[in-house]
A protein has these predicted regions:
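Vicinal oxygen chelate
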Residues: 1-9, 12-21, 51-56, 70-151
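Short, flexible, solvent-exposed loop/turn segments with mixed acidic/basic and small polar residues
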Residues: 4-6, 67-71
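Core segments of cupin and vicinal oxygen chelate
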Residues: 8, 17-61
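A short beta-turn/loop motif at secondary-structure boundaries
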Residues: 43-46, 70-71, 107-111
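Short, charged/polar, Gly/Pro-enriched secondary-structure boundary elements
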Residues: 58-62, 73, 122-126
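Acetyl-CoA-dependent GNAT
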Residues: 65-68, 131-133
């Protein structure tokens, strides 16, 4: 991976958010079945209810915000969780399997790389990969890298 551009080097954290039309079920899914640590919940904060997940020691957080109605789902919008090996991936997916959550068809890339895909309660896909992007990717696993300085 490349270094941060100078103008972004001072960023201290990154959060990405998505709306959920099945808020309570989605929070339970990510907390209880996926196992993401729930850092904080909020109610009526500037008109929104939400939950913030993260990983210990990481400056990256994932926020679920309750939607008033149906939220369109784009199946290319995936949350990808990278594990160091197949055993760690299997351990991470055991709760989903025990709860009866059925896998959905994975994108051909994930299937070829040993990943499995599960839907969250909104129908968004969560991919569990048996490798860490940029560290121990399987042979042929890296997407083409940009050689342009303006990528």
């Amino acid at each position: 991976m490349s270094d941060w551009p100078d103008e972004l080097a001072s960023i201290g954290a990154i959060r990405f958010a998505r709306r959920s039309s099945n808020f309570a079920q989605t929070v339970r899914f990510y907390r209880d079945l996926v196992g993401l640590p729930l850092y904080e919940t909020f109610e009526d904060s500037y008109g929104s209810n939400g939950a913030i997940f993260g990983l210990p020691g990481s400056a990256l957080t994932f926020e679920i915000v309750e939607a008033d109605g149906a939220v369109p789902v784009d199946h290319h919008e995936q949350l990808c969780l990278y594990f160091p090996d197949e055993q760690a991936k299997q351990t991470a997916t055991a709760r989903l399997q025990a709860a009866g959550v059925e896998q959905v068809e994975s994108h051909p890339y994930w299937e070829a790389m040993g990943g499995v895909t599960y839907p969250d309660p909104d129908g968004r896909e969560v991919v569990f990969a048996p490798f860490v992007f940029g560290a121990n990717e399987p042979e042929g696993g890296s997407p083409p890298r940009s050689t342009s300085e303006n990528h």
